[in-house]
Amino acid sequence: MSSHLSQDANMNGVYVRSDVSSMLSFDGSESRESMDDSKKGHQSLVEWLNETLPYLKLPWEASEDELRACLRDGTVLCSLLNQLSPGSMRMGGSFEPASVKIERFLTAMDEMALPRFEVSDIEQGDMVPVLQSLKALKASFSDGSYDKNSLAARRRWSLPEDHSDSRGDDRNFTDGFQSKEGSEIDMSDAKISDLLKSNSLRNAPTRSLFDMLDKLLDESMTKMNGHVSHAMASLLSALVQVIEQRISNQADNLKNQNILFRVREEKYRSRIKVLESLAAGTTKENEIVTNCMEHIKLEKTRIEEKERSEEKDVVRLRKEKERSDAEIRQLKQELKLVKETHENQCLELEAKAQKTRDELEKKLKDAELHVVDSSRKVKELEKLCQSKSQRWEKKECIYQNFIDNHSGALQELSATSLSIKHEVVRTQRKYFEDLNYYGLKLKGVADAAKNYHVVLEENRRLYNEVQELKGNIRVYCRIRPFLPGQNSRQTTIEYIGETGELVVANPFKQGKDTHRLFKFNKVFDQAATQEEVFLDTRPLIRSILDGYNVCIFAYGQTGSGKTYTMSGPSITSKEDWGVNYRALNDLFLLTQSRQNTVMYEVGVQMVEIYNEQVRDILSDGGSSRRLGIWNTALPNGLAVPDASMHCVRSTEDVLELMNIGLMNRTVGATALNERSSRSHCVLSVHVRGVDVETDSILRGSLHLVDLAGSERVDRSEATGERLKEAQHINKSLSALGDVIFALAHKNPHVPYRNSKLTQVLQSSLGGQAKTLMFVQVNPDGDSYAETVSTLKFAERVSGVELGAAKSSKEGRDVRQLMEQVSNLKDVIAKKDEELQNFQKVKGNNATSLKRGLSNLRLVGPTSPRRHSIGASPNARRGKASGLFGRGTSDVDNCSEYSSKHSDSGSQQSSDERKHQKDYHQPSKFAGAAKGIDFDDEDVELVGLADADSEDRLSDISDSCLSMGTETDGSISSAVELTLFPETAKPLELIERPEARMTSEKLEKSVKMGKTEPKDRTNIPSKIPKQTLKPPGQTRPSRLSIATSSSSKALTGAKRPTISTSSSAKPLNRRR
């Protein structure tokens, strides 16, 4: 025994020495290797993290601080575990705290029996436990020991199963239970009682018990709606007791194993001490002891690992026990709630049953009473039926007698019915005959009704022809649609008729007085397009090429769409073109279609009237230049001759010119319109055509007028320059209204001179021209007053009769006569020079000659811009070539523009003026014989204060004799007045003693005037006479009287004064 102890001691000494030597060697050279290994392990861990989660992109040599920053919020740890085992971790929201995520990760590590770390380690502590835990996780998933379902399997109920010998005994329970996993469990009371009586629950595996518990709970919650029977509750309590007993037995076993492990540990420690005491033995013994020590160390490490695993199992079992205890408590609470619910339902059912029983008893008593009452009523009804049957028998006898009495009457009625039937057939036959007769009549009426629309259209055409013959101003009304964003506003338009009726009403007032009816030639509604508006205007446009003068102007308040109708919103789109562009485009198309028969030339002028100033907006100098106006339009329709005339040959030329004009036109912003026209714009198109065969000349003009809108200052909020412009606009439109009023009432005096606008439109409003007015209406309810005022003005305009329009056509004979007149005027000019020389010689006759000169000077005002008579006819014709020079030549040939007056002509006395008035009385009668009505004011002459003003053109006012659009008549009158002037009175003056002339030159100069004016018509001449007009017609167009040969013979060298609408002072300055 002692030898055995000594041997053990020696072995212990060997083990101790070998252990010490091994520890020394570890402290020495192996420390470097361990550092290298730890470094490599750290790098491999970083590499594994980057491979598992590619989005981390950690550096290869990442420090512990970098790893701490990456893993601190717990998201990377949870994502890592989900990546390794999908679905094992429940990911929370982005606002979940980091500590909750880390605790969830640590719980999963505990379930997998892997080393864990504390939350404080990853936040501020040492990172070694964290790295060890991650390395263990890497190793567990790298060697393939965990599959995808390993973590999910660990999350289930993981209590250890009882591996006793009873496994074979409870196989029947397990097989019977597992056979029902795919189907429903038998929940009958008999089955549950058999399970409780048998020992199969106690012998069954723990996992089977938990699965059965889960299925029973699921079945009770889904199929029984929370109602648990008493047998089911007993089964659940038995299952819970068995599970609690097994958990307690497992805990006792773990305690016993811990005690056994501690005993073994003490035993091994004692052996280690003994071996350490025997470590001083021989080398062989040391080797033996060393081997024994290594073996013991291995066993020790194995035992320690087993202890750690058992401790973990204990911890896990404790947690599972706590979890099962919580579930058991929850099940008990649910069971208690189910029992209480069941008891409450039983009480409710018992109460309902008692209530139903009481109600049934009450109904039974009521039924018995009802049966007694019914039997009593049956007896009463039997008695009543017997009495009624007797009564009906008596009535039957009475009715039988009645039927017998009336049977004879019925036979008589049948005979009468037969006769009535024959009468009805005869009447029906007559009705059919009448029906056929009236059908024929109705067919005739229907045929007449079919032709009604044709007759109506013919009446409308005849009405238009009558309007054409009367020369009425056509009025088309166009209603502007609401602007974007204004559809919710109230409108003033109540009704739009097909034949030009328009009814407006004030939406803010009720009653019949608020409705107003207007009648125009045509009314365009809000949906009318530019093309539809132009289609009704096209016949007027085409008449220009036939030699007629046409004027189209737009009238309305500001912002009502006048510029939109006349010009359009844009010239880029052909659909948006206004009347201006479409009219010129149509003119060019017609000229091209007629180019084989008539050669046309088209010229365009564009001026604006801004603040009572006429400006040329197509000239290079812009609108700064002020132009004068001819109140008497020239034969070619030029009302503003000094405005630049541009020859156009295509629509593109017109678009370019009009674009320049619109850019130069004055516009401004007001409260009602962002781009309000602040001036009246007049686009004049002059057409001259020459017939290829007959060489006859056709002259037509088209005036397209875009009037500035009338506006109320309180609504437009105009101030400063805008206010001044608004005042001028309203003043000019008011003057236009006065002219329309005078024309509508056929007043003898029409105030054209009140405004530049009316002077420009004088030839269109006062002459025989075709005139059309577009009246623009704003449908907004706030503009009701302006709308009614505009429509009233348009209604007055529609009643104006201008007379039938006439074509301006010159034949070849007329041109020859005009040339003869020009030659005669040259001869007269030479006679004037001879007469002036004679006056210097005969100074004693100066007084009588002054009187004659004064009388004749008053008749013919001339323009400072015209050629003098002394110029050669060829020179004058050279300046009058083509479209734009012909009008000037005609005016030179037909008007009174002659040589200068003498100095004495401007210093006449009041006696001489009185004598002039008496002297010209015969001239007035002579003019009446010709069909021309010369008033006293027709021979008045007014001039400018400054005769040298080059910016003003001579302006013959409407009180003077004016030239109308009847070109043939006016030219013939001009020729007659030029060739046969009134010279009777001058001859009497010359024959007086104080003014006797004996020179042969004087006799030659007055040789043509010896006959009386009444005998002039008897003189044979090729010049056509002016036709007489009936007295009921409007006042004929008047021609300014040209200075005759005798007047030129008596006039001096001084140029006559000029007249404009802005000055009325005679010119007294000597030359």
UniProtKB/Swiss-Prot annotation:
Pfam families in the cross-refs: CH, Kinesin
Calponin-homology (CH) domain span: 39-142
Gene3D superfamilies found in the cross-reference section: Calponin-like domain, Kinesin motor domain
PROSITE patterns membership: CH, KINESIN_MOTOR_1, KINESIN_MOTOR_2
One GO BP annotation of this record: microtubule-based movement
Biased composition (Polar residues): 1034-1049
Entry keyword Nucleotide-binding: yes
Stored InterPro entries: CH_dom, CH_dom_sf, Kinesin-like_fam, Kinesin_motor_CS, Kinesin_motor_dom, Kinesin_motor_dom_sf, P-loop_NTPase
Domain Kinesin motor: 472-800
Bias (Basic and acidic residues) ranges: 158-173, 910-921, 995-1017
Region (Disordered): 157-181, 852-931, 995-1071
GO-annotated cellular components: microtubule
Binding site for ATP: G556, Q557, T558, G559, S560, G561, K562, T563
PANTHER family to which the protein is assigned, alphabetical: KINESIN-LIKE PROTEIN KIN-14J, KINESIN-LIKE PROTEIN KLP-3
UniProt family annotation: Belongs to the TRAFAC class myosin-kinesin ATPase superfamily. Kinesin family. KIN-14 subfamily.
Protein name, entry field: Kinesin-like protein KIN-14J
